[in-house]
């Protein structure tokens, strides 16, 4: 994030500054009352950011069911937000209250690199989370096949950090050497390229506009996919967004009913031995084998029928034909059961995907609300060299970025049952043991 020289960034607002006045060297002071109020609000934001994201990380330790590929990306986001609360905000509080950076030029460089890195990685993590959920809805089969590949997820997480550093890190560290010297006044801490409009518009395109358009595309694609599947289900279509499993189910041989050992054909044109049903008793699978073979009676004769008399030869086929009706009805029943099972599975997946879309829409909306004001004001401010945007509006805009780090942990339990259960396991373990389902409502009311 671009750090402005905080000359009068609160003093520009009389309502906020009160009796504040700029001191020599760009320093400023607030009235004791306003200093206490601002310090309390900033401390509250720090506590909320640190505790909320620490709870997310502890949830991964306490609940192994959370360690899925998508949730690893949420963990990566929580790590970024946690470090914002631990390192970035605390160092900025005295700077914004006094108007002077008192920690030296070296720590200023480190703070800028880390701050830009963490904020950018948060954005890239949101893109990664959105893309992962896009795949889970639109390419469900291949996505489920990759769920156990944690190394793949770790590689993506590392790539996010590398790209986030490359966007701003080299520029922060080398700009003053490439330009022939530093332009930052003593007692201030902000990036050398703060007023370079061309660099900022390029970086903003990569940091905000492209990610925001990407997550909007993923969210819209998920919505359209769900709408299409909902129409298919309402119209009586029994297919998911993908290959129809019904032809395969119809072409496969029926499976034996539960508790009926050996009474179903092994395959097309193959019957089971009749001696499994007892002497002189025809099993219901024999006629299925005969039907597949063209109705011949010799192969289906009982081993006990060694005389080959004509009476037995004519009676056996009649008994098999009488038994053919239960076999056909059983196959039809099983087909209907499979169709019902597929319909239930489709409804479950559709309901799950709708929840994914809703949670993703919430996260994306919060992301846009927190990042859009800062990005737009930063570009406008750089274009007019800081003279057309009041400092307090710019200051408020990048505090919204840090507020996003505190809000993200709240979005997880609101949008994900698995996180609600993990948080309950940490915060209300006794209620979870007594009432594992209803306790969630008591803990979060």
Swiss-Prot record:
Glycosylation, residue list: 11
UniProt main location, coarse: membrane
Disulfide bridge positions per record: 108-189
Keywords recorded for this protein, A-Z: Cell membrane, Disulfide bond, G-protein coupled receptor, Glycoprotein, Membrane, Phosphoprotein, Receptor, Transducer, Transmembrane, Transmembrane helix
Subcellular location per the Swiss-Prot or TrEMBL entry: Cell membrane
Sequence ranges of Low complexity compositional bias: 299-312
CDD domains: 7tmA_Histamine_H3R
Gene Ontology cellular-component terms listed: dendrite; plasma membrane; synapse
Gene3D superfamilies per record: Rhodopsin 7-helix transmembrane proteins
Example GO molecular function: G protein-coupled serotonin receptor activity
Source taxon at top rank: Eukaryota
InterPro entries (UniProt xref): 7tmA_HRH3, GPCR_Rhodpsn, GPCR_Rhodpsn_7TM, Histamine_H3_rcpt
SUPFAM superfamilies, per database record: Family A G protein-coupled receptor-like (SSF81321)
Record topological domains on the Extracellular side: 1-40, 93-109, 179-197, 381-398
Ranges annotated as spanning the membrane: 41-61, 72-92, 110-130, 158-178, 198-218, 360-380, 399-419
PROSITE patterns in UniProt: G_PROTEIN_RECEP_F1_1 (PS00237), G_PROTEIN_RECEP_F1_2 (PS50262)
Entry annotated with the keyword Transmembrane: yes
Topology, Cytoplasmic side: 62-71, 131-157, 219-359, 420-445
Keyword Phosphoprotein appears in the UniProt entry: yes
Membrane topology field: Multi-pass membrane protein
Tissue: Expressed widely and abundantly throughout the brain. Highly expressed in discrete neuronal populations such as pyramidal cells in cerebral cortex or cerebellar Purkinje cells.
Described function: The H3 subclass of histamine receptors could mediate the histamine signals in CNS and peripheral nervous system. Signals through the inhibition of adenylate cyclase and displays high constitutive activity (spontaneous activity in the absence of agonist).
Name of the protein in question: Histamine H3 receptor
Gene encoding the protein: HRH3
């Amino acid at each position: 994030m671009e750090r402005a020289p905080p000359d009068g960034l609160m003093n520009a607002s009389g309502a906020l500054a009160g009796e504040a006045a700029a001191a020599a060297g760009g320093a400023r002071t607030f009235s004791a009352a306003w200093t206490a109020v601002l310090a309390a609000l900033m401390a509250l934001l720090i506590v909320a950011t640190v505790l909320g994201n620490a709870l997310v990380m502890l949830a991964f330790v306490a609940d192994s069911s959370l360690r899925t590929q998508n949730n690893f990306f949420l963990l990566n986001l929580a790590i970024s937000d946690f470090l914002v609360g631990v390192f970035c905000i605390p160092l900025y509080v005295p700077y914004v209250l006094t108007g002077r950076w008192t920690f030296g030029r070296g720590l200023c460089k480190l703070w800028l690199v880390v701050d830009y890195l963490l904020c950018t990685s948060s954005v890239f993590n949101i893109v990664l989370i959105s893309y992962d959920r896009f795949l889970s809805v639109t390419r469900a089969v291949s996505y489920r096949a990759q769920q156990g590949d944690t190394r793949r997820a770790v590689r993506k997480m590392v790539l996010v950090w590398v790209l986030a550093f490359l966007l701003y890190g080299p520029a922060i560290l080398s700009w003053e050497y490439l330009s022939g010297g530093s332009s930052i006044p003593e007692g201030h801490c902000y990036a050398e390229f703060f007023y370079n409009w061309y660099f900022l518009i390029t970086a903003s395109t990569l940091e905000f506009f492209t990610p925001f358009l990407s997550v909007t595309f993923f969210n819209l694609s998920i919505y359209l996919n769900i709408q299409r599947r909902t129409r298919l289900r309402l119209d009586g279509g029994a297919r998911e967004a993908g290959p129809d499993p019904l032809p395969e189910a119809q072409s496969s041989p029926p499976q034996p009913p539960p508790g009926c050992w050996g009474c179903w054909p092994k395959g097309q044109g193959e019957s089971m031995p009749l001696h499994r049903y007892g002497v002189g008793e025809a099993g219901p699978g024999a006629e299925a084998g005969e039907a597949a073979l063209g109705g011949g009676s010799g192969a289906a004769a009982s081993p006990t029928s060694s005389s080959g008399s004509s009476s037995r030869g004519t009676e056996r086929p009649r008994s098999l034909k009488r038994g053919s009706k239960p076999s056909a009805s059983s196959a039809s029943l099983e087909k209907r059961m499979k169709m019902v099972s597929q319909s239930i599975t489709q409804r479950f997946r559709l309901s799950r995907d709708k929840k994914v879309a809703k949670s993703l829409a919430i996260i994306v909306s919060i992301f846009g609300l927190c990042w859009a004001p800062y990005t737009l004001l930063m570009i406008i401010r750089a274009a007019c060299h800081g003279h057309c945007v009041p400092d307090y509006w710019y200051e408020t805009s990048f505090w919204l970025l840090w507020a996003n780090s505190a809000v993200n942990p709240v979005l997880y339990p609101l949008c994900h049952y698995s996180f609600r259960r993990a948080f309950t396991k940490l915060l209300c373990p006794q209620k979870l043991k007594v009432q594992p389902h209803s306790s969630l409502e008591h803990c979060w009311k």
